[in-house]
C-alpha cells in the first residue's frame, strides 16, 4: 500500500503527539473506499427494486434537477482530477497509482449516483435512504483528509495545491448534496409527508414539524391530520391478514376436530337431563341456562393460530424493528467502555487532551445513533401495533357479518364491542413492546458478560440472586394473568348490564328500578375493583423485586469482589463502569413487569379473539341461489333448526313458489312462520334438505330495524337516488303525510334505533327500504303488524297486493290479517313447523280443514271491526270499513290520520249527508291549511331540531379543575404520602451513588491497601442499606398509589353511574348509546389502568432527573449555566408537543365512538344486511371509520417519536456537555467524580424522554377524566326522594287533576301540551286518542314526570306530583308500555328486582298474566335465565311478563301506553281480560291503538296539537258528531252505544 500512495499507509507514531493525525495514504484509500464500497454494494438492489415496481414516472422537479446538476459538477471535477494526474505523469515525475484510481472510481460512482437518483424520481419522489447514508459517510470520512490538506497548505502553501483545491470544491459539493438529501421534494397535500420524506427527515421526524406547529397555533381538527399511507389502511392490512388466517385457521380447526373426536369417544352426558325432543318453546330458557353453564366448563375451540397469522402478515416490519433494536442494544454497551476510557484519561496525567475530546465526541455520536435507532424502532413497533389493532377490529366486524346464529348467541353486543375496544387495544399494547422480551435477554446477557470482565467471578453471586428471583417472578406473573382473565370477564358483565340499562332506561325510570340495576353494576364493579387491587398489589411486588434486583446484584457483587481477595480494590474505573452496566441492566429489568403484564393481558385477549374469530360461519350451503329456474323459491324436504341440540323447528317442508306469486304464510303463534322466513334467509342451521332461490331478496322483519341517519338514507340503503321511484315508494308506503310533519322532511335525522319515530312509522320506513330495492323476491314478515287497519289496507293495495308497487315480484307475505287472504295467489298454513295446508283462498275454504275452521272462528268473534275487506274502495264504503282486531297497528301517525279523514270525507259525501258534507269540507280545508302551515314552518330553522348532537370535543389545555378533580378523588393525604416516599427513594439513590464515589476514593487515598476490615464492612453495609431503602420506599409508594388510585377509580365510576341513571330522558334521546358506553368502557379502563401507571412513572422520572442534575451540578458547578438553555429547549419542545398530542388523543377518543355505535347497529340488523347482501357496503363503511380513527392514532404515534428524538438530543447534549466539561476541568477533578457524573448523565437521556412522555401521557389520559366529568356534570332530573314524602297508602283513591298543565321537551322547543285541564275521578277508565304529535305519549310522560312541567299542575289525591320525589311518584304508579323490554337475568328479577314480594305473590301474578303454566314447565322455574333483551321469549310472552309486573305492583293508577300494539289477537285478549278483572277498582288511562279497546271506557279524551278538543263519555262524544265520531264512523262502530268487548 505504501507504493500505491508513494507514502506511509499506517504510522502509530503520528497518534502519539499532542497534534495527532492519520497518514494521508490511509485517508486517500480506506476512508475513500468505505463510502464508495457501501454505495456499490447497495445500488444494484435499489435499481432492481425500481425495475420490478415499474411505477408510473413522476414529473421532473427543480429539486430533482438541482441534485442532478451538483452530481454532474462532481463528475466534471473527477474528470479534471484524472486529467491533472495524467498531465503530472510526465518525465521523471511519477504519479502514485492512487491518483489515477480514485478519479476513475469517482467517475463511475457519480454516474451510478445519477442513475440511482433518476430511478428514485421514476419510482417515487423520495430520497433514497442509502444515498443519504452514502453522503453522510462520504462527508465524515472526508473530514480527515480535509484537515490534513489544510495543515499541509498551512505548512507549505505550494504542495499539491491543485489537487487540494479540487478536493475542497468536491468536498463542498458533497456537503451541499448531503444538505439537499435532508429535504424532500414537493408532495401531495392530502398524502402523509412520511411517504416522500427524506432519510434524515424520516429518522428525525422533521416532516411532522408542520403538524406540531399547526397544533400549537390552534386546536387540531380531523381536517388538519394527514391521511395514513395506503399500506397502513384497513383494507390493505386486513387482506394480507386474511390470506394468512385462512390457512392457519384451517389447520387449527383440523386440530380442533381431532381433539373433539377424542373427547366424543367418552360417554356423553345429557345436558342437565334435557331430552333432545323436548318442546323448544317450553324449554328454551332451560337450554339457555344449561348451555351457559356448559360453556364455562369447556375451553375447546381452534387455538394457537392468531399469533402465527399476525406474524406472517407483518413479518417484514417485525424484522426491521428487530434489526434496529439489535443495533441499539449493541451500541448501548459502548458507553461504559468510553466512560472507562474517560475516567482513565482524567486519572492519567500523560494523556493527550485530544484523546479526551475524541472520547466526548464518540460518546455523543454513539448516544445520537442510539437515539435514531431506538426511535425508528419504536415508530415501527407502534405502527405495527396500530396495524394489528386495525386488523383485529376489521376482522371482528367482518366475522360478525358471517357468524352463525348459534355462535352469535354466545356473545352479547356488549361482549363483542369489548372484543373490538379492549381486547384489540391489549393486543396493540403488547405488540408495541413484544421485542423487549428478547432485547432484555440480550441486554442482561451482555451486561453480565462485561461485568465479568470488570469484576470477574464475583458477578456470579449477583447472577445467583437474579436466578433465585426468577421463580418468584414466574409465580407472580401467573397470578397476575389469572386475575386479568377474571377481570376481563367482570368487565364484560358490567358492560353487558350497562348496554341493557341504556337500552331500557325508560322502563327503569317508569318503574323506579334504577337503584336495583345500579346495585347490580356496583356489585360487579366491586369485584372488578377487588381484582384490580390484587392485580396492583402483585404488580407492585413484581416492580419491587425487579427494581431492587440490580441494587441487590450490585451490593452482592461488590461485596463478594472485595471480600474474596484483599488485593481486589474497588477503584473508580471498575465501580462506575459496573454501575453504568448495572443501570443498563436496570432498564430491561424495570421494563419486564410492564412487558410481562402487557403480554399476559394480551394472551387473555388472544384466547378470546381466537374463540370468536374461530367460531363457525353461517352455513349457506343449504340455500342454493340459481339464475335459470322455473321456480322463484323451492323447498325440498327442508328441515331447519335454531340449535343442533334441539329438534328441527322447520320439518320436512316441500313448497314451490312460482315467480311473481303473492304467497301468504299464516298460522298460530309459535307455528314457525318467522322461522320459515329465517330459513329462507339462511339464518338457521340446516338439518337436511335444501332451499333453491332464483334472484335477489329483500326482507322486511317483524321488528323494524332503523339506522341512525336520515329517513332518506334509511330508504335508499346504499342504492342510487331515483327521484321518480323514490316518490312512488314514499306515496305507496304512506310516508308523505309524516314527512310533512317531521322537521326536515325526509332529511329528518332518526335517532338511535328510530327513537323519534312511532312503531308504525318505523315499520313503514322499513317497508319503503325494501320496496325501493329492485329485488326479485320480497320476504315480508308480518310488515303490517305495527300500522292501523286503514294504513294497512293502503299499503297492501299500493305495495304488496296484486296491483301494488311490487306486483309482478315474488312476495312471501307472513300475516295475521286474515282479511287480506282473498287477494293472495296461494296460502300456506303452518303448524308446529310443518305445512298443514296450502292452496288458494277458495280451495282452502272448500277443504274445510284447519284454515276453514280458523276463518269461521275469526268471523264469529271479529265484531263490527272485523268486517273490512280490501277488494275495492266502494265495497269498503258500503261495508263500513273498520279496524280488524288481528291487525297490530299504531294509529298515532300522520298517515293514519290523513287516510281516516280522507276516507271519512269520501263516505260522508257518498251518503249525501249535507251536515256531514259541510263538516267534511271544513275538515278537508282545515287539513289543507294545516299542511301549508307545516310546510312553511319546515322552512324555518328551529334550534334544537337536530336530535343526535355531534360529540363535543374539548380543545386547548385540559382544565386544571380536571386534575384537581382526579387528585381529590385520589385523596390529598395519599398524594403527600406518595410524594414523600418517592422523594425518599430518590434521596436513597443519590446517597448510594455518593457513598459509592467515596468508597472508590478510598483506593486512591490508601494507595491500593485496605485500611481495615471494619471500614470495608461499613462501606458495604451502608451501601447495601441505602439500596434496600430505595426498594422499600418504592414498594410503599407504589402500593399506596395503587390503593389511592383504585379509590379514585371507584369514586369516578360511582359518580358517573349515579349521574347517568339520574340524567333526564332527553339526555338519552339525544346521546347515542355507544357514546355513553365508551365512557364506561374505554375511559374507565384508562382511569383504572393507564392513568395510575402514568402518574407513578412520571413521579419516578421527575425525582430521578432532579437528583441527576443536582449531582452533576455538585461535581461541575459550571454545568448549572448550561442547564438554562437546555431547559428552555426542553420546555419549548414539550409545550409544542403537548398541545398537539393532547388534541390528537381527544380526536382518537371521539373517532372511536362511531366505530362501536356502528358495530352495535350492524349486529342488531344482521339478518337485514345479509338478506339485502349489503355486507360489503357495511364493511367498507366500517373500514372508512377505522381509517379515520387510525390517522389520528398514527399522527399521535408520530408526535411521540417527534418529541422523543428531540428530547433525546437534549439528553445527548447533557452527556456531551458533561463529558466536555470534565475534559476541560480534568486537572481539578478525580476519577471517582468523573465516573459519578457521567454514569448519571448517561442515564438522563432516557429519563428526560420518559418524563415528557409521561407528562403527555398524563395529560392525554386525564382526558378520560375530562370525558367522564362531562357526563358526571350532566344536568340531573329532580331528586328521587325528598323530605316531603307522601303517605304510605298514597294514592288511596286514584283521582287525577290536570290544572292548565303545560310542557315542552327542551327549553328551546315549543310547548307540546298547551294548558291541559281535566279531572279523572277515582276508578274511572279513560281512553286517550289523537294523531301523531297530539300529545298522548307526552301526557303519559308528564304523569311519571319523565317530562317536567313548564306550567300548571298535576294533582293526584290532593298532592301535587311536582312536590314529591320522583321515586315516591313512580313507585306508586304502574305502566304497561308498548315495547315489552326485558333484561338479562332471572324471570323473577324481571318481575321483582328488589325482592319485595314473596314467591307466592309472584306466582299469582304469573297466573293472572297467563304465564304460570309456561314458567312452571321450565326446569328452573322463576330462576330461568332471560337473555339480553328477552330474545329467548316471544313478543307475546314478553308483553305478558310486563302485565305480570303491573299485576304484582297493582297500583291505584294504571297507564296502558299502546300496550297491545305489537302483539297478536290472542295476547291482546288475554291482557284486556286481566286488566278489566284485576284493575276494576283502579284508575286506568289507556292510550288507544284500536278503538274497540276503549269503547267501554268511562270517558274518552281526544287530543290535538297539545290540547283537549273533546272529553266525555263515548256516548256523549258520538252524539256530538265531532272528531271522535268521525274516527268511530271510519271503524264502523259509530252506532255502538257502549260496546263491551
Swiss-Prot record:
Keywords annotated in UniProt: ATP-binding, Cell membrane, Glycoprotein, Lipid transport, Membrane, Nucleotide-binding, Phosphoprotein, Repeat, Translocase, Transmembrane, Transmembrane helix, Transport
CC per GO annotation: apical plasma membrane; brush border membrane; cell surface; intercellular canaliculus; intracellular canaliculus; membrane; plasma membrane
Annotated organism of origin: Rattus norvegicus
Gene3D superfamilies xref list: ABC transporter type 1, transmembrane domain, P-loop containing nucleotide triphosphate hydrolases
Short name of one Pfam family: ABC_membrane
Protein name as annotated: ATP-binding cassette sub-family C member 2
Glycosylation sites: 6, 1007, 1010-1011
Extracellular compartment spans: 1-26, 89-92, 147-164, 331-356, 455-457, 562-583, 989-1029, 1115, 1229-1230
Catalytic activity annotation: an S-substituted glutathione(in) + ATP + H2O = an S-substituted glutathione(out) + ADP + phosphate + H(+); taurolithocholate 3-sulfate(in) + ATP + H2O = taurolithocholate 3-sulfate(out) + ADP + phosphate + H(+); ATP + H2O + xenobioticSide 1 = ADP + phosphate + xenobioticSide 2; 17beta-estradiol 17-O-(beta-D-glucuronate)(in) + ATP + H2O = 17beta-estradiol 17-O-(beta-D-glucuronate)(out) + ADP + phosphate + H(+)
Main location group: membrane
Membrane topology, record value: Multi-pass membrane protein
Sites where the protein binds ATP 2: 1330-1337
Compositionally biased spans, kind Low complexity: 906-915
Molecular function per GO: ABC-type glutathione S-conjugate transporter activity; ABC-type xenobiotic transporter activity; ATP binding; ATP hydrolysis activity; ATPase-coupled transmembrane transporter activity; bilirubin transmembrane transporter activity; organic anion transmembrane transporter activity; protein domain specific binding
Translocase keyword on record: yes
Stated role: ATP-dependent transporter of the ATP-binding cassette (ABC) family that binds and hydrolyzes ATP to enable active transport of various substrates including many drugs, toxicants and endogenous compound across cell membranes. Transports a wide variety of conjugated organic anions such as sulfate-, glucuronide- and glutathione (GSH)-conjugates of endo- and xenobiotics substrates. Mediates hepatobiliary excretion of mono- and bis-glucuronidated bilirubin molecules and therefore play an important role in bilirubin detoxification.
Tissue and organ expression note: Mainly expressed in the liver.
